[in-house]
Amino acid sequence: MTLFPAIGLAPLRLLAIVLFAAVVPCVLMTAPAVATQYALQLGLGPARIGQLFSVELAAMSLATLPAYYWQSRWDWRQVARGAALLFIGANLASAFSDQYVTLMALRALSALAGGSLMVVCIASAAQSPQADRVYGLWVSGQLILGAVGLWVLPPLFANYGLKALYLGLAMLMVLCLPLAGAFSAGKASNGRHAVSPPTGQGWLPGLCGLFAVLVFYAGLSAVWTFIGSVAADSAIEPADSGRILSIATLLGIAGSLCATLIGPRWPRNRLLGLGLGLMTAAICLLLDAPSLLRFAGAALLFKFCWTFVLPFILACLADLDRHGRLMNSANLVIGGGLALGPAIAGPVLETGLGMRSVLIGSACCLLLAFTALMITRRCRFLVTTGVHP
């Protein structure tokens, strides 16, 4: 099969990675619209709505744990087909469920299937010799579908309710299902290339890389979750801040596409430093009650750099592990970081330390991420395959 020279993957495999990864987190990417509909249609309060989203995020991340077993034993194409069918079934059932406990169980089942698909996508992207470009498209697909969802879901909800979301997800996955055969068979077909268990210093690059992903997501999620509080404390009108954050979504798409275009053309260390440095600068611009103009500049810069630098961060892990085991762990760490940031920032705000402490802590997280990535890059010569010496 002909390969894309700029990507290094078969066209159908690249398409499968991007499309499956876009559909799987669609509920989380359209959370503002979905949360509003949960309240209007099901009469749920903030606590129960939060629990539904937390269950989806947790189940998607915990799909990593069974993947440690099947990733080296089962054909990834069969796993993708089975997970896609489970995702379709869970969403079809969700469309006709009006009981909270039943809906929560179905959303957990859907997210577990989606998380397994995400593991296949992330690990398959790691097999590309230009993983940074693949991860750029991986991020772009999620952002584009999320933006489209935020645009089309409100009028669909008005006419069809939550069925529009769940039936739509099932339909999209049905359309993606034929692409499951485009994934590689995984390690099951490459047993002769297996390597011995990692020992000694060989773990250091992988551990530092995973730590970098954890603190990166913890720092950005703490800021993005409570960025509305910065606007409120600065007496910025909710309508103005809402428009700014909507535009920021477009900047996020632009950031990931820029990463795809640049790929390996520029030195990765400089790209990591540039992206994380500008994200830190954006956080600093949010300090001390910013004006509307400063808030807008900070929010737009933060979102652009977030999606710009993420593909290069994931590519650092992919360089260490072409078989996908380390990238499987990254799926778990991403979910942990997304949950950890708000979990720490919320109590910090309630104790009276204020948003300034949250912002400074988040900036420190990004600096820690950069330091850990530099250690990973420096130690790369210690490994030959994955994290093995």
Question: How does the language model describe each region?
Answer:
Residues 267-313:
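C-terminal transmembrane helical hairpin of 12-TM major facilitator-type secondary transporters
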Residues 63-76, 255-268, 349-350:
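Helix-to-loop junctions at the C-terminal end of transmembrane segments
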Residues 32, 205-246, 250-253:
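Extracytoplasmic gate region of multi-pass secondary transporters
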Residues 128, 137-185:
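Helix-loop-helix hairpin linking two adjacent transmembrane segments in secondary transporters
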Residues 43, 96-101, 267, 288-290:
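Helix-breaking motifs and short loop linkers at transmembrane-helix boundaries and internal kinks
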Residues 322-354, 362:
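A late C-terminal transmembrane helix in Major Facilitator Superfamily
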Residues 62-98:
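Conserved MFS/SLC helix-loop-helix module at the cytosolic interface between two early adjacent transmembrane helices
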Residues 108-141:
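Cytoplasmic helix-loop-helix junction between adjacent transmembrane helices
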